[in-house]
Regions:
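C-terminal segment of N-terminal export signals and the immediately downstream linker at the start
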Residues: 1, 21-38
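N-terminal export signals
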Residues: 5-26
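Active-site acidic carboxylates
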Residues: 30-144, 239-241
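Glycine-centered short loops/turns at secondary-structure junctions
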Residues: 100-101, 171, 197
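Internal catalytic-core helix/loop-beta-alpha segment
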Residues: 138-178
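A short glycine-rich beta-strand->turn/loop micro-motif centered on a GG-aromatic cluster
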Residues: 176-179, 197-212
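Short glycine/serine/threonine-rich phosphate/pyrophosphate-binding segments
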Residues: 183-189
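A charged, well-structured terminal subsegment
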Residues: 228-242
Length: 242
């Protein structure tokens, strides 16, 4: 596993939180209580995408977004959405490794000072602690020696990272997005992708949000503006047959 500028206390790492929550007068936690999030995938709709892009294995890279214990522990572990999300991300990881696709992970370092947190401290509190358990990518999604872990600085993984450069170096112009949270970091990263001429693909049943409403809103917003929305089944089919 290769780490790219994965810093513990000397970079600005900002939490994933719902976009647009800017009216609170005092900070609230950037994660929900442990085990509190559950909603069925039967409530999730896969919208029609404006983007005409076709996923191709020789052009694509996979980004596993913020699947750290600190964020994932908010989900009821035996229920959807996280039960299905973990299974589907693992299937996509296995396929990516089989085809020798680049695999990247975004991971926040934790232990931010007040200055490093900046305005996010006012909105969401201190964020992830400086704790290896909280930082860890959850099983069974742990990075392999061939994968690259990137420091997560703000909502978008493109912000203050070399993700765009390493995509260019790998001759990849497509990015598959999976993980949490759908209506914050996933949405922001897909926005930066399209603004940098990287075709974004969001896998609808391999991402999750705080609520089914937020999940659906994220998919609908991105389908219209930034990304092609796929299911795990359609993504695997495209990768295995291109």
């Amino acid at each position: 596993m290769r780490r790219r500028t994965f810093l513990r206390s000397s970079s600005v790492a900002l939490p994933a939180a719902a976009l647009g929550l800017t009216t609170a007068r005092s900070a609230h936690a950037d994660v929900r209580p442990t085990g509190s999030i559950a909603y069925p995938f039967s409530t999730i709709q896969v919208p029609t995408s404006s983007a005409p892009w076709t996923l191709e294995v020789h052009r694509a890279a996979l980004l596993v977004h913020d699947m750290q214990h600190y964020f994932v522990k908010a989900y009821a572990p035996q229920d959807d959405p996280i039960g299905t999300v973990l299974k589907n991300i693992k299937s996509l990881l296995d396929t990516a490794h089989t085809h020798q696709m680049p695999v990247y992970y975004s991971a926040q370092p934790g232990g931010m000072t007040k200055e490093q947190r900046g305005l996010f401290g006012q909105l969401y509190g201190p964020g992830m602690p400086d704790d290896d358990t909280e930082r860890a990518i959850v099983d069974p999604l742990a990075p392999t020696a061939a994968d690259t872990v990137l420091t997560k600085w703000k909502y978008s993984e493109f912000f203050r990272s070399d993700l765009l450069e390493i995509l260019h170096d790998a001759n990849r112009d497509q990015l598959i997005l999976v993980g949490v949270y759908a209506f914050s970091g996933i949405t922001a990263t897909s926005t930066d992708a399209v603004q940098n001429d990287i075709q974004a693909f969001i896998v609808a049943d391999a991402v999750a949000d705080y609520t089914s409403t937020g999940h659906n809103q994220a998919l609908a917003w991105c389908a219209e503006r930034t990304a092609r929305i796929l299911t795990t089944r359609s993504a695997l089919g495209a990768l295995n047959n291109s």
